[in-house]
């Protein structure tokens, strides 16, 4: 990428490049540092009660009925895995997201890998200047602080849930990082996700050891009624990134999470400027990943991950934080236009599919030279239609899975979704220092009725807020969410 002032001659290496007026404001692509994409076909969950730590809500019957169960069925039923992957990736694109946590896939041949699509994933970039981030640790590393420190020292970035909740048990997950010699199992590689239970002194420790954090305000407020003390984090000098978490208790994309961050910061009079909030999903996010030499800002020599918002605001930072999805007129990843209005997309070459965001016509370019064989040439429209059908027929699909003979299932070469919130027994997405292994969520799930008896038909979550007439109503019905968020958010879309 080369960057020159408006009206300046074209750079030497770009003499033959066409000049295209965007009629908008160009931003770095958004980097979502925390998102459980494999669940993002699901609509917002009406959180049944106020929780104080992460170990509680996963045991509620509604969680199995409305979240874990549906995605277990879709994630293991042939024909639906690729639909989920395509749909949630396009959900990112339509919200201006160019990088996210990846979608893990597991085959019945015993192979685990990450889906490689058009949106970058932080775990497997395939690029020397974009070092892979880790988002999971082994059981041993999750239960032994010394082993955890060794893992940190061998990682460029480790994105890990930390102190998710409001009670002392949640905070203990952070305090357990203190080693017997008085030092801390914290390095510049650690990016703690959520950090809701941390106190001001804890943020000082995090900053002194070079750690950073990922803030997910909407999900925190929906589940716990509180969010991280980002004012204390800012005062301590902790670098802060943003993550939309997942659609059952979070934003549809990082564009929405930026707006919630702005609302919360204003309500608390924290003093974050719009520029600082936007940096959480661009420049600071790239710093956390150790990608700042290649991404995070618009500078000569960096990769062209870009987002264009229609129109020119006198304050460009407010311009993005106040934009809806219909105003996103172009998204470019590594120099390749992936979604935008037809005028801009046609200027760059062919596209693969038309789509409508509310009343705004958009076209998508989902083609890849080395398309992931799991998804292939599946279109967004085909993915949407499959998921609508699958969610409407969950009990029937669950019964078919239940009745399928294990030998038949094993004979099919197939991939299934890894539902990382359920923590497979040999990996973890959060530390468990000092816990008895028997208390782990994956091991305390009590045997319940068969899924085909429990599940009910569900609606597919629309990919954008602009297309979801029920979104703000659902938010207003959330009992843990402060009124200032549910009342203030509609004006920013």
Regions found by a protein language model. Name each.
Residues 81-83, 93-190, 196-197, 428, ...:
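Metal-coordinating catalytic core of metallo-dependent amide/deamination hydrolases
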Residues 166-173, 191-199, 220-226, 247, ...:
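A general structural motif
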